[in-house]
Swiss-Prot record:
This is N-succinylglutamate 5-semialdehyde dehydrogenase. Catalyzes the NAD-dependent reduction of succinylglutamate semialdehyde into succinylglutamate. It comes from Idiomarina loihiensis (strain ATCC BAA-735 / DSM 15497 / L2-TR). Coiled coil: none annotated. One of its GO terms (biological process) is arginine catabolic process to succinate. Keywords: Arginine metabolism, NAD, Oxidoreductase. It catalyses: N-succinyl-L-glutamate 5-semialdehyde + NAD(+) + H2O = N-succinyl-L-glutamate + NADH + 2 H(+). Its EC number is 1.2.1.71. PANTHER family: ALDEHYDE DEHYDROGENASE-RELATED (PTHR11699). The keyword Oxidoreductase applies.
């Protein structure tokens, strides 16, 4: 039976490209299959978005918001179905995918506030006229979604883009096509007009056809640094196109002078191992004071990590960690651990892949203190590297020794230490005594260096979804009392 997985110009249709499949990484079962969108279908989607743009952008923001709010209501009505779809396709526990759907539901209200605050109309009086600042949508924008948050993260681009009046062509991760399909069905049910939101499913060729098409006015990407850099090169010399890149990080978390050891360990675990380490903000490097207290924190961290429950997404009791996105990804994490051990790192908690055909791995901790030539890589999984330090300035210097700059944090009881850390650390998200995976949709989200291109998302997504237009306006004309030199009337 043909699976109509492409949503183009208001209609579902089968892809014309190669067959690809989605596999439940916790159970090694094929749960979805369909044909990729061809280059012709990608162009069809872009032209449909172009044709729909004048009407959609010409509507009042209240009309556009009404459809977005209906979408939010449908998320509420279908939250359990969508959460379980996410769990099957990503391997994340159901308790966690429910929180993702909740974040999607809250995005419309937050994006509405951001639209008015960041891109609203400003009026100022001036002699004989008024000055206005208004904003207009870019046109047709492409949205590329990741697999780790297949609902929430693309939603964070799509909702503000639609509110601003853009039309969208959405290319989700090829690893989570079912979540994308179910999400777009809710947009269809919400009454999104034909061509305003289009879905093109597929693998690399589909993505390349979309990013290379001359008719897109912008591209919003969340994913790996390697892909983001390729897109940046592709858009080089094209200042007419808006490009927003949200990429990863080699994120540091520093611990010093904490009285509550268990609270500190809880924050470390939440920073490093939540979502099986598959958040771009996850702590990859733990800087811990080489002292009696630091050793106590590390010993407790080892104990807690060894007892983290890893299991199926529907298991009862629910696990803290589910499967990674694929058996291949899980195997690559074990390989990354072994490479560090080969370089001289010491295993504190050994990561293991429990089944070579599934995405389950246990969390790992390696001590890399004194190890030379460590790769500045984002190991996208539950692998934490420990650096012991005696001098906080040296620790901060090493924390900054990365091409990335997404998230960072410090766990300490002294506010002065936090202020010092905040002043000297280079990152777009800096937390104190909270997990560094914690970020608010009511704040900007983004990093510096190889983590982004200065287009923060979340609350600041409104900024790249519209461009400012300055106007000086007068309802009548008259000659000035004093003419400029050299003029005669």
């Amino acid at each position: 039976m043909t699976n109509s997985i492409q949503f183009i110009d208001g209609c579902w249709e089968a892809g014309e490209g190669q067959l690809f499949k989605s596999i439940d990484p916790a159970r090694n079962e094929v749960i979805w299959s369909g044909e990729a969108a061809s280059e012709t279908q990608v162009e069809k989607a872009i032209l449909a978005a172009r044709a729909a743009f004048p009407d959609w952008s010409g509507r009042s923001v209240e009309e556009r918001l009404a459809i977005c709010q209906k979408f939010s209501e449908l998320l509420e009505e279908n939250k359990e179905h969508l959460a379980r779809t996410m769990a099957k396709e990503t391997g994340k526990p159901v308790w966690e995918t429910r929180t993702e759907v909740g974040a999607m539901m809250g995005k419309v209200a937050i994006s509405e506030r951001a639209y008015h605050e960041r891109t609203g109309t400003v009026e100022n009086d001036m002699p004989g006229a008024k000055a206005f600042i208004r904003h207009k949508p870019h046109g047709v924008v492409a949205v590329y979604g990741p697999y780790n948050f297949p609902g929430h993260l693309p939603n964070g681009h799509i909702v503000p883009a639609l509110i601003a009046g853009n039309t969208v062509v959405f290319k989700p991760s090829e690893l989570t096509p079912m979540v994308a399909q179910e999400t777009v069905k809710l947009w269809e049910k919400a009454g999104i007009p034909a061509g305003v939101l289009n879905l093109v499913q597929g693998e690399v060729d589909t993505g390349k056809a979309l990013s290379a098409h001359p008719q897109i006015d912008g591209l919003y990407f969340t994913g790996s640094s390697n892909t983001g850099h390729l897109l940046h090169k592709q858009f080089g010399g094209r200042p007419d196109k808006i490009l927003a890149l949200e990429m990863g990080g080699n994120n540091p978390l520093l611990v010093t002078n904490v009285a509550d050891v268990d609270a500190a360990v809880h924050n470390i675990v939440q920073s490093a191992f939540i979502t099986s380490g598959q958040r771009c903000t996850c702590a990859r490097r733990l800087f811990i004071e080489d002292s009696e207290q630091g050793r106590a924190v590390l010993e407790r961290l080892i104990e807690v990590t060894e007892n983290i429950l890893v299991d199926d997404y529907e298991a009862d009791p629910q696990p803290f960690m589910g499967a990674m996105i694929s058996a291949k990804a899980a195997g690559e994490m074990v390989d990354a651990q072994n490479e560090l051990l080969h370089k001289g790192a010491k295993s504190l908690v050994r990561m293991k892949q429990t089944d070579s055909k599934k995405g389950f791995v246990t969390p790992g901790i390696v001590d890399v203190t004194g190890v030379e030539d460590l790769p500045d890589e984002e190991h996208f999984g539950p692998l934490l590297k420990v650096y012991r330090f005696k001098d906080i300035d040296a620790a901060i210097k090493e924390a900054n020794n990365t091409r990335y700059g997404l998230s960072a944090g410090v766990l300490c009881d002294d506010e002065q230490t936090y202020r010092y850390f905040f002043k000297h650390i280079r990152a777009g998200i800096v937390n104190w005594n909270k997990p560094i995976t914690g970020a608010s949709s009511a704040a900007p989200f983004g990093g510096i260096g190889a983590s982004g291109n200065h287009r923060a998302s979340a609350y600041y997504a409104a900024d790249y979804c519209a461009y400012p237009v300055a106007s000086v306006e007068a309802d009548s004309m008259s000659l000035p009392e004093s003419l400029a030199p050299g003029l005669k009337f």
